From Swiss-Prot:
Gene giving rise to this polypeptide: gltX
Primary location class: cytoplasm
Organism this protein belongs to: Escherichia coli (strain K12)
Protein name listed in UniProt: Glutamate--tRNA ligase
MF terms in GO: ATP binding; glutamate-tRNA ligase activity; tRNA binding; zinc ion binding
Cofactor names: Zn(2+)
Ways its activity is controlled: Inhibited by 1,10-phenanthroline. Phosphorylation of Ser-239 by HipA inhibits aminoacylation of tRNA(Glu).
Effect ascribed to mutating C100S: Loss of activity. Strong decrease in zinc content
EC number: 6.1.1.17
Posttranslational modification: Phosphorylated by HipA on Ser-239 in the presence but not absence of tRNA(Glu). Phosphorylated protein cannot aminoacylate tRNA(Glu).
Length: 471
């Protein structure tokens, strides 16, 4: 049997992390079994579905490289198929027309609730033989079995059973002729030959209804697996107050897709004590029986740790392709300065996100207007003039501009003046970067370049002279 899974988001908003994890699990299960992964857009909610949301879902899937083998299919383009199946069910007696008014249904609901009963349709039209005009408004309901139960073996939660007496005669076509969500899902899974439905636990109550419709259609019933929800680190349902929720917001915040995928796969699934997984390892090891039934807690610090790991573990050239977007957001002109791959090597240990990296690299490419006030006050003092003049001259004398030779020039300055490296290094750092923090000074000065470094040292010397004149 060829394994076929699907991810079927409703385009009413962005791709959130819960949806992304569901998509990842479905994708991994298909890839693990050499099967196929289908993308289906469930856009039957015409009022809330938007083209922008569809684009956001696609962007998120593409950024995570969760490529699909079929689709995207759109439910709104399949209404003729759904209605043909409903008409067939009406002929076979597995569905019926319901003419009950909203007023009657509301009165029925209130009566049942007053008695402490679960509100459900009483089946009046199911057994009615009244004649109605062809143009009289009606809905179509599924004639749910009235006896027995629905049992399915959830691949994560184990056997789950629902009594058919608890289930309503579901509306499958509205008065305007449009099919309903639960029905469209059934026909889609049937037509697309979906073998395994992996989705959120909020769909558990839909499953027995969908199974009954599939059986009425004499269609194969897929295997179901319902993934637990994701909570914030405070135990409450994940929301915007816990930080980013949209997948693309994590891109904007400077996370690599590999970090988010690695984090999401471990958010409810485990393989021994292993924390770091390549995409190939995820595919190799993923199984549904290793997915936890319990809700997971989203921990941003853990994601940040993973992101820092991947910034340094992945090839710098690859990381640079993602960094480029953030550089553009900061409007930094990188034509005069180190290659971005070299920048990743320089700043990788210091920066936990690509956004942080982009925001802290400008001095490598562009001159700064002024020195950081605190750093200048502390390190650009008259006592720093001589170390800066000596190190400037030694840097100017370098013919082979390497980080090693830059280091020798700084060390030689400290030796010549008989001072500690800090007496040379800190004024030099503020002079060439404008701030009090940077990567190792030799590689920083080397990356900034000989001409620009000397110009900035002269600017720092002018700054010191101006301060002296003002005193």
């Amino acid at each position: 049997m060829k394994i076929k899974t699907r991810f079927a988001p409703s385009p009413t908003g962005y791709l959130h992390v819960g949806g992304a994890r569901t998509a990842l699990y479905s994708w991994l299960f298909a890839r693990n079994h050499g099967g196929e992964f289908v993308l289906r857009i469930e856009d039957t909610d015409l009022e809330r579905s938007t083209p922008e949301a569809i684009e956001a879902i696609m962007d998120g899937m593409n950024w995570l490289s969760l490529e699909w083998d079929e689709g995207p299919y759109y439910q709104t383009k399949r209404f003729d198929r759904y209605n043909a199946v409903i008409d067939q069910m009406l002929e076979e007696g597995t569905a019926y027309k319901c003419y009950c008014s909203k007023e009657r249904l509301e009165a029925l609901r209130e009566e049942q609730m007053a008695k402490g009963e679960k509100p459900r349709y009483d089946g009046r039209c199911r057994h009615s033989h009244e004649h109605h005009a062809d143009d009289e408004p009606c809905v179509v309901r599924f004639a749910n079995p009235q006896e027995g139960s629905v049992v399915f073996d959830d691949q994560i939660r184990g056997p789950i059973e629902f009594s058919n007496q608890e289930l309503d005669d579901l509306i499958i076509r509205r008065t305007d002729g449009s099919p309903t969500y639960n029905f469209c899902v059934v026909v889609d899974d049937w037509d697309m030959e979906i073998t395994h439905v992996i989705r959120g636990e909020d769909h558990i109550n839909n499953t027995p209804r969908q199974i009954n419709i599939l059986k009425a259609l004499k269609a194969p019933v897929p295997v179901y697996a319902h993934v637990s929800m994701i909570n914030g680190d405070d135990g409450k349902k994940l929301s915007k107050r816990h930080g980013a929720v949209s997948v693309m917001q994590y891109r904007d915040d400077g996370y690599l897709p590999e970090a988010l995928l690695n984090y999401l796969v471990r958010l409810g699934w485990s393989h021994g004590d292993q924390e770091i997984f390549t995409r190939e390892e995820m595919i190799k090891y993923f199984t549904l029986n290793a997915v936890s039934k319990s809700a997971s807690a989203f921990n941003t610090d853990k994601l940040l740790w993973l992101n820092h790991h991947y910034i340094n573990a992945l090839p710098p050239e690859y990381v640079a392709t993602h960094l480029q977007w953030h550089i553009e957001q900061e409007n930094i002109d990188t034509r005069n300065g180190p290659q971005l791959a070299d920048l990743v090597k320089l700043l990788g240990e210091r920066c936990k996100t690509l956004k942080e990296m982009a925001q802290s690299c400008r001095y490598f490419y562009e001159d700064f207007a002024e020195f950081d006030a605190d750093a200048a006050k502390k390190h650009l003092r008259p006592v720093a003039r001589q170390p800066l003049e000596v190190v400037r001259d030694k840097l100017a004398a370098i013919t082979d501009w390497t980080a090693e030779n830059v280091h020798h020039a700084i060390q030689a300055t400290a030796d010549e003046l008989e001072v500690g490296m800090g007496k040379v290094g800190m004024p030099l750092r503020v002079a060439v970067t404008g701030a009090g923090q940077s990567p190792a000074l030799d590689v920083t000065v080397h990356a900034i370049g000989k001409t620009r470094s000397i110009e900035r040292i002269n600017k720092a010397l002018d700054f010191i002279a101006e301060r002296e004149n003002q005193q």
